Amino acid sequence: MMMEDDDDDFYDPADAVPINQAQDAPQNQSNEKSQELNEGEEQEEEIEVEEDEDDFNIITEAPPDAPPPEVPHPRHANLRAEPQRPSSADISTKSVTPTVTPKLEAATPAPASARPTAPQKPGSAYPPVQASTIDVNANPVHPSTGKPILSTDMDSDFPTEDDKPWRRPGSDISDYFNYGFDEFTWASYVLKQQELRKEVQDQKKQLDDMQNFLTMGLPPIPGAPGPAAPPGSAPPALPGMPGMPDIAPDMMQGMLASMMSQGMDPSSMDPMSFMQHAQAMMGGQGGAGAGQQQGQPGFGGQSQNSGFGGQGGGQPHMGFGGYDQRGGFGGRGRGRRW
């Protein structure tokens, strides 16, 4: 009914309104104004709330298509402040223009009279050259024992406590031992030095013996032929070591080549092992060409060193057909007894 009344108030003529309604019209208008004011205030409040919400959304949520704000950078500012580079055409035009290169003038050498000269002094005017006089390999004699230092025994040469002053309370051990040694480390050092020197001497002796044996420079053995054979004859057999027969040079070369082919180094072998290998190799080859030596009558013309079948004549301690000066005793072809 209120809506209809409102419509009537707006659209119907005034005379069509009844009297009672005409009296109530001012009151209705005042009520309507108050309602409109209330509704207007509510709408304003809603608009303010919506505006507040819109402002909040704008601040917190940026639209997805909006570009991010550019952060100022000092380098970008410097680049913007720099002048623009000229184009390639400008560069080409500038490069065409000839440039004058400055000439470098050679510096004139100073005269010899202006140069500072070193003072000319005789050699005696300078201090003498000082060189160390310490012999690092020296082995001086200890004054109290009368023995070389490396041969001094701490227990036998210093038997009592009075002879060992470094053991006394308050004594400085550096007054008696150098380079951080003490009584025990010095004794072990001396022992190691003696062992090393002995080992080095033994190795040198073995090396010298091996070199002499390989080069056949051994002194002549008593009973060996002294004078040399005349030219044109076969080379004499070289004197061997005790316990070995004389060795021809070609046989020695063959023995060395055979040892090297078996993987042995003759220069690193001691003399005893070399002799054993040489005897073993000679034992297998001794009877091969021994049948041409002069034989004895009554033994079939066999050589003195021939064994069974002319083989193994140089092998000692053979049982059947071994080395025997009677020549092949018990073997075949003894010859005919007369």
Curated annotation (Swiss-Prot):
User: What spans are recorded as compositionally biased (Gly residues)?
Assistant: 283-332
What GO cellular-component annotations does this UniProt entry give?
mRNA cleavage and polyadenylation specificity factor complex
Q: Which UniProt keywords apply?
A: mRNA processing, Nucleus
Output one GO BP term.
Answer: mRNA processing
Determine the domain of life of the protein's source: Eukaryota
Give me the stretches of Low complexity compositional bias: 106-118
Q: Tell me yes or no: is Protein transport among this UniProt entry's keywords.
A: no
Q: Does the keyword Transferase apply?
A: no
The cellular location(s) given in this protein's UniProt record come to: Nucleus
**Stretches with biased composition (Polar residues):** 20-31, 85-100
Q: Where is the composition biased (Acidic residues)?
A: 1-12, 38-56
Q: Its principal location?
A: nucleus
> Where is the segment annotated Disordered?
1-169, 282-338
Q: Which PANTHER family match?
A: FIP1-LIKE 1 PROTEIN, PRE-MRNA 3'-END-PROCESSING FACTOR FIP1
Q: Which family does it belong to?
A: Belongs to the FIP1 family.
Q: What does this protein do?
A: Pre-mRNA polyadenylation factor that directly interacts with poly(A) polymerase.
- Report the protein name in the record: Pre-mRNA polyadenylation factor fip1
Output the lineage of the source organism: Eukaryota, Fungi, Dikarya, Ascomycota, Pezizomycotina
Give the gene symbol: fip1
